[in-house]
């Protein structure tokens, strides 16, 4: 199990390194395609504990428009990059 996880993470890192050398293409992700892509990208990404979150009053001040929008707004209604999708992991 651990070996599989390490291999998967290695493939992800190599893929991200390779893709960062080229200009990333923005695409639309909707419905099951969005859910499956997020599941594939976020596999193995641990959720942050509550202690790592900033207090509510602080986060609302700095979230800006990102705090009011969701992954569907950013990646289904308009094209987004894999980096944007990765920002929703964890």
From Swiss-Prot:
It comes from the Eukaryota. PROSITE patterns: INSULIN. The keyword Lipid metabolism does not apply. Disulfide bonds join 30-76, 42-89, 75-80. GO terms for molecular function: growth factor activity; hormone activity. Keywords: Cleavage on pair of basic residues, Disulfide bond, Hormone, Secreted, Signal. InterPro entries: Bombyxin, Bombyxin_B, Insulin-like, Insulin-like_sf, Insulin_CS, Insulin_family. It is found in: Secreted. Residues 1-20 form the signal peptide. Residues 49-67 form a propeptide. It holds the Pfam family Insulin. One of its GO terms (cellular component) is extracellular space. Coiled coil: none annotated. Gene3D superfamilies: Insulin-like. The keyword Signal applies. Heterodimer of a B chain and an A chain linked by two disulfide bonds. Belongs to the insulin family. Silk worm has two kinds of PTTH: 4K-PTTH and 22K-PTTH; there are many forms of 4K-PTTH. This is Bombyxin B-12. It comes from Bombyx mori. The gene is BBXB12.
